[in-house]
């Protein structure tokens, strides 16, 4: 908790870093079938949960895609998650009504990893993270459509506002999941606040499909320091992904330097190589904006491989705040 508060209070720690030499920058690529293609968080700020799902799957050899939605909502139930939500609603985004209509989005990779290892994981096929199934009342029954998650949350909030008037006979639409039909959805809506609705939804949907991890380990968080790349390389060399907390503006502007709290983003580091052109060790960032390299807004100077981008140590260091990793057990 102390490190997380420090991260919020001091997002920029300006020290010169120790660059990795060419000799110590041997090629590493940890992408495999377990990770699969880069996923797309769309308009939901659950980057830390998508990265966490990758880290857990890769570390524990889970071949089935994990639900990032499950990880994110699990994070929101922790003390840190509750505090960050309060901070968002009361200090950072109190003038934005949309914030109150959705499951809380901002979070910390370390906290979500610890909660997920404690709670177990739910498959993406059971609790999707990109779109949800909407059932709209029609003349001859229910009409089924897929709705992007951000829009689904806004529509669920609208129902929550009138929850006392709703029954299975008059609800205009609901969202269908395993273990949750129209009746169950109406019952879940009766929660006093929207965050409790999502907590109970997650538990109901995943109750028959939650898997425990084979073992639980430690989660390390290291704040930016001059020898941070030594720590990163050690983890990559041991076959471990590294979660990177940094300013997302560097993805769209290669000249960006510095960190704004409102621009904090989390991605995974999945590879390393030496660039003779840049005379620098480069790292492969596995982002969560999908596989499209052309229309995702990335700086055109970057080499992009299906949503994975190569950045130099200098670019990473001057825009980062910390790393998180699961040390080998």
What do the predicted segments below correspond to?
Residues 14-34:
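Non-catalytic, low-structured ubiquitin/UBL-interacting segments
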Residues 3-13:
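Sec-dependent N-terminal signal peptides
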Residues 41-57, 101-114, 265:
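Active-site nucleophilic cysteine motif
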């Amino acid at each position: 908790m102390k490190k997380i508060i420090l991260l919020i209070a001091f997002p920029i720690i300006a020290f010169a870093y120790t660059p990795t030499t060419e000799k110590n920058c041997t090629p590493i690529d940890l992408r495999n079938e377990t990770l699969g293609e880069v996923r797309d968080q769309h308009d939901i700020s659950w980057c830390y949960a998508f990265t966490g799902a990758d880290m857990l799957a890769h570390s524990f050899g889970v071949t089935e895609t994990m639900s990032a939605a499950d990880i994110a909502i699990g994070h929101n139930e922790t003390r840190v998650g509750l505090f960050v939500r309060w901070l968002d609603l009361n200090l950072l985004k109190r003038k934005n009504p949309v914030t109150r209509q959705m499951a809380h989005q901002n979070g910390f990779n370390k906290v979500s990893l610890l909660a997920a290892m404690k709670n177990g994981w739910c498959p993406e096929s059971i609790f999707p993270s990109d779109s949800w199934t909407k059932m709209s009342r029609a003349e001859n029954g229910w009409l089924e459509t897929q709705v992007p998650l951000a829009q689904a949350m806004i529509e669920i909030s609208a129902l929550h506002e009138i929850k006392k008037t709703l029954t299975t006979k008059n609800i205009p639409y609901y969202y269908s999941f395993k273990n949750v039909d129209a009746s169950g959805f109406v019952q879940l809506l009766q929660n006093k606040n929207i965050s409790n609705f999502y907590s109970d939804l997650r538990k109901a949907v995943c109750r028959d499909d939650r898997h425990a991890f084979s073992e639980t380990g430690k989660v390390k968080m290291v704040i930016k320091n001059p020898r941070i790349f030594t720590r990163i390389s050690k983890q990559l060399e041991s076959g471990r992904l590294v979660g990177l907390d940094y300013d997302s503006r560097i993805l769209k502007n290669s000249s960006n330097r510095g960190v704004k709290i409102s621009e904090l983003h989390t991605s995974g580091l999945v590879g390393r190589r030496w660039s003779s052109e840049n005379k620098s060790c480069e790292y492969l960032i596995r982002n969560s904006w999908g596989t499209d390299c052309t229309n995702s807004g990335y700086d055109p100077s970057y080499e992009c491989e299906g949503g994975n981008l190569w950045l130099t140590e200098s670019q990473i260091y001057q825009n980062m705040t910390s790393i998180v990793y699961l040390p080998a057990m």
